[in-house]
Amino acid sequence: MKKYLFIPFVAVFLASCHESLEERAEREAKEFTKKNCPMKVSEYVTNDSMTYEKDSHTIHYYYSIKGKADTTALDKKQAKAELIKGIKDATGIRNYKENGFNFAYTYYSTKNKGQILLDVKITPKEYNTK
């Protein structure tokens, strides 16, 4: 009898510890930002933060650009193609890709505070093509 009372308790306990993929994405984004940001990616680019936008199922990366790269003359088509390739090649986000998450990248100017130089959203349709 005690055995049968224990089984539902364990099931409820384990279920309460289970974290959905969306909850995990939100938690990991907050942890990444807190532990790593701002993080210098290159001489001209800094990763400022990462968020998870539950309503659009999107992992969103925010960057600042400085120096000679801080210009509106970015080749947006080429930049998007490189970001798509990066997503395709990234193994650390495989679980998110397999579950159809979107990925967004926003690059801000450092010299013109608040100015968006590049704002790209990449969907599963784009990163799942060959």
Predicted regions: what they are:
Residues I87-I116:
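A short amphipathic beta-strand at an alpha->beta junction
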Residues T71-Y96:
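Short, non-transmembrane amphipathic alpha-helical segments
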Residues E26-T46:
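Post-signal peptide N-terminal segment of mature Sec-exported envelope proteins
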Residues F13-S16:
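C-terminal motif of bacterial Sec signal peptides marking the signal peptidase cleavage site
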Residues M1-Y4:
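Positively charged n-region of N-terminal signal peptides that target proteins for export
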Residues V41-K66:
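Short edge beta-strands and adjacent turn/loop segments
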Residues I116-K130:
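Short, low-complexity, Pro/Ser/Thr/Gly-rich segments in the mature regions of secreted, periplasmic
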